[in-house]
Amino acid sequence: MDLESESSALESVDDNVLIQQSASNVCDDGRSLDNGSCSDESVKLLSTSNSVELGKPMSFDSPGDGGGAYSPVLKGQGLRKWRRIRRDLVKDTSANMENSKALKRGLSGVAHSHGKQMQFQSPEVEQESQGSVGSVNMLKSSGDGFDILGSSGYDSRFVAGVGFSAGMDLEIDDDRSSKSSTVARAPKVIRYEKPMISSGQGGNIRVENSKKHRGESVDFEKENSYSSLESDSRKQSGRMMDYNGENGETSMRKDDAGGEGGESINTDNRYSDEMDPLTEAINGFLALQDALEKEVQQFQEIGNEPMPQHHEQVSEANSPHPEIVTLVNNVEQLENMLEETRSMLEVKESHIRDLESTTNQSKHSWGGTEIVVEDIFRQKIEAEIEYLIYSRSIDNLNSQMKLIDEQESLAEEQTHETLNKLGRVQTKAANFTNRAQDLQNDCIEITGTIKKRACKITSYVLIQLVLLSTVVLLLLSQLLPEPDTVVPT
């Protein structure tokens, strides 16, 4: 694929050089192409218009390095074939990336007006690639008559308007998440071969179609439109995330030809959730405008270079005024869309101002309520502390009451036990008293009986002694003899 695209590019450039040689036969200032590296931007755009390689960055040479004219190098008799020398590609610079994107977005033809040559894109590619930044490839006029196709010089107003409208279209396409929706919405125009248009000294417009157009160029252009749409959407999403995230402020700059000053929208970080759609739209506009301004500056540098007059005597072709009319209509439609978006942004700005005013009022009203809330919060904390203290004291008292109740229950049990013991002792004492009385009664009875027995015994003993004495006396009297003398009585 790469070899075919490079060979087709070299063959198209060879054909153009042969046509130029046959038309002029003599070079203007004798300057030659230096091993395929030409300082003329139009020749490079022409050679890479139909077969630009996808994903491969291409670098523009500086406008002032070489002269404005060129001529093929003569070697002996005839022309020398172009010999391509591989260049050192710089992939990291932003200028090369943007230039490659500009080429991939469909820079197609070179138009020449008042000694200057430019490139013009076919209407189908123009319509298909409206979703990207470089879809509408126009050159900003710098006051020296740099016109499109030799007539109706467009100023930077159309370019800026187209850039902003393309940004809106890209926003819609990103929301729908469909690449094919942009192609489906774009009007289709019958495809024709890309001409190289030049104007002679007499004002005649002559066109020469390139001879060798390969069938793969159509596929390349369609893939370029799709890849440009995807790359722009990725680039836009990346810039929207990185844009001015520190202070939360976004600014929207108006286009150059509108004459309106820059307007800025200051958003607060607290309302970032509500402002996401608006900030995304504004960031997309700013990113698209920056990319478009860079492309316009590059086109101005290309247009300010002196161009050779090698294409003065080529065959005529039909004038592309209908295409210009369609482009103007498209630009007007895009400007209308831009006005609508501006009105929507103004409405959103008014809504943001209303929200800010309401927030400021709420802040002032919150100033007094905060003190009340703080007092209530302080009272709440004090009440909670008191509640904790009381709850703890109540818990302690409850525990003490439980202990006292337990002690009372124990005391009651002890009193019951003691009362029971006392009852038992009293019953025992009563029993003992009864026994004592019984014993006393028994003792009295025993003593009475003993006394009676003692009296009886003593009476018996006395009686027995008396009897004994009488008996003894009787015995003695019998034993003893009776005396002889008589005692006188």
From Swiss-Prot:
Organism domain of life: Eukaryota
Segments carrying motif Nuclear localization signal 2: 83-84
GO terms under biological process: nucleus organization
One cellular component (GO) term of this entry: nuclear membrane
Residue ranges occupied by any KASH domain in the UniProt entry: 459-489
Annotated localization: Nucleus envelope; Nucleus membrane
Motif (Nuclear localization signal 3) on chain: 104-105
GO molecular function, one term: protein heterodimerization activity
Ranges in coiled-coil conformation: 323-446
Comp. bias intervals (Basic and acidic residues): 215-224
Region of interest (Disordered), residue spans: 49-73, 195-264
Transmembrane feature ranges: 460-480
Membrane topology: Single-pass membrane protein
Entry keywords, A to Z: Coiled coil, Membrane, Nucleus, Transmembrane, Transmembrane helix
Motif annotated as Nuclear localization signal 1, chain positions: 80-81
Keyword Lipoprotein among UniProt keywords: no
Tissues expressed in: Expressed in seedlings, roots, stems, leaves, and flowers.
Subunit structure of this chain's protein: Homodimer and heterodimer with WIP2. Component of Ran complexes at least composed of WIT1 or WIT2, RANGAP1 or RANGAP2, and WIP1 or WIP2 or WIP3. Interacts with RANGAP1, RANGAP2, WPP1/MAF1, and WPP2/MAF2. Interacts with SUN1 and SUN2. Interacts with KIN1. Core component of the LINC complex which is composed of inner nuclear membrane SUN domain-containing proteins coupled to outer nuclear membrane WIP and WIT proteins. The LINC complex also involves nucleoskeletal proteins CRWN/LINC and possibly KAKU4 and the cytoskeletal myosin KAKU1. Interacts with WIT1 and SUN2. Interacts with WIT2.
Written domain comment of the UniProt record: The KASH domain, which contains a transmembrane domain, mediates the nuclear envelope targeting and is involved in the binding to the SUN proteins.
Protein name: WPP domain-interacting protein 1
